Amino acid sequence: MRYAALFYHRIWHIRSRVIARRIIQIMKNISFVVVVLLVAVGLAAAEIKNKGWWRNAVFYQVYPRSFMDSNGDGIGDLKGITSRLQHFNSTGVTAIWLSPINKSPMNDFGYDISNFTDIAPVFGTLKDIDDLLKEAHKIGLKVILDLVPNHTSDEHPWFEKSVKKEGNYTDYYIWVNGIGKDKKSPPNNWVSVFNGSAWTYHETRKQFYFHQFLKSQPDLNYRNPVVQEEMKNIMKFWLDKGIDGFRIDAVPHLYELKDITKNEPKLDHVDPSLNASNHAYYNHIYTKDQNETYELVQSWRNFVDDYAKQNNRDEIVLLTEAYTSLSNTIKYYNYGSHVPFNFKFITDADANSNVSQLKNVIDSWINEMPQGTAANWVMGNHDRVRLGSRYPGRADQMIMLEMILPGVAVTYYGEEIGMVDIPYMKYDVRDGCRSPFQWDNTTSAGFSKNKTTWLPVNDNYKEINLQKESNQKNSTYQLYTKLIELRKRHTLKHGSLITKELSKYVLAVLRETESETVSLLINTSQNRASVNLTELGSTRVSEKPTKIQLGSTNFDKEPGISVNNSIIELPGQAAVILISSGASLTSYSVISLLFAVLFSLFPW
């Protein structure tokens, strides 16, 4: 019995060891699986979602002061915007971009910020922006915030502390000693964008501070790394709230030459009416477009990308405003900007431009932009004469052009209903393009219950308003919404682009894939024009079934009608979009089509 007991004890001991080893192995396997799952979850969390959502987007600029007044004070506000979110949903825009809403003394209508992380009381509260974001995201609408990094208000606590040389704030701005016997003369001839010296002497600090814009807008010193971190903290504050991206203001002015002893040279050809105090008098080689500016923008791109990865967010988009040369603007593509604003239809073209000039505006941008990037087209903004006033009678065709071209389209509020500038307001004060949105034909065009608004409502509001155009079969608003719907077609997302000068007055724009051609014909003259479709160089358009898809409000044929005999008549200042289906391709290079498809599938 003793030996039997020992035998069974030994057997039990061996089995226990085997079971223990198996348990240990199972635990190891479980641990391995847990580790793999944790790594997988970690990788999933460290991922930018929905990359490229912006590549074919329509961004809509909201000027908050003029969009919708919720409390009857005559000034638009955040609650007003929230109350009108359905408008964006109905039109189909991808994102709204809010002009500055930060706390500000309003010397430059919000572009002079005294607190980057608070809301100007005239627009509402932080809760109001939280509510706006919540409701916008419910309907799939993204919200872009204006970021003004070049300068602050002189009422910002940073500047007040810098004046007193308090700690790190001493060098938050660009301070220099004056020259001359009394040390009260500016150190050089640099002038402000708003004319006059860009240097202002501060009696308390006994030094000059630099300002590219108003003297109440001192420039920040980005050669101070603490200032760079401050701006990233501000970006994080808004990203934490759910902002989907930033439109970065006045980017070319972020840096100036470090050597302040150099004077800027006079331009070779200067308007005789200008003098040395005018900004347009000089070639701004020291106060604009410095290499460090591009590096700073790249650092912001790295920051938002890292934030999106760490928070498993959709790609955070950066749009940059730069009034500069084509080459300097295009360069931002290589330094982190998703959308370096293309202002060429504003700065390089107007109602007097011929077809060759319009074609060049398009081709020059397309030919210069890096492969794999997205083009963009801006027709108007809060600083320029409205599209409908710059191109009288032709606003429809310019919107059609913008929407047919590849890439991003940017709409300034009111363009979708054909708003124009208030005629009696001088264009150089910028107010003509900032009048209240025209919602209907009631008091103050439905913008406010108050008969007195911060700017007067345009007298034409009973004829041009959203309510009226929504109920009309043929209106600018109906055209606008149909164009946004049309942009969803594969051809307009991924098709190649061809521009053709059919005559001095007729421009053709073709978008094409292997199975479809979308053609836009624009008649810039006031006279009727006859267009032979064989001139487009497309056997598909001239031989395959071609139908009218959309026409400008002054086009005289109904959508859906087939084009017979390859001839189409365009009324004066009219435009039409045609769609042709079939296997034939245009005479453009098949290799170009192949590259277009590849870049659409594998964007850089």
Language-model features: locations:
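C-terminal beta-strand-rich structural cap/linker in extracellular carbohydrate-active enzymes
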Residues: E558-S581
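C-terminal GPI-anchoring signal of eukaryotic secretory precursors
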Residues: S580-I591
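Cleavable N-terminal signal peptides of Sec/SRP-targeted secreted and luminal proteins
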Residues: N29-A46, S589-P603
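Beta-strand-rich binding/interaction modules
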Residues: R528-N554
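Acidic/aromatic-lined carbohydrate-recognition and catalytic surfaces
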Residues: A46-K236, D240, H253-Y323, F437
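Loop/helix patches that line or flank the sugar-binding groove of alpha-linked glycan CAZymes
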Residues: D259, E264-Y286, E295-E315, Y332-N334, ...
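Substrate-binding cleft/loops of secretory-pathway carbohydrate-active enzymes
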Residues: S153-V163, K309-N312, V317-A351, V420-V429
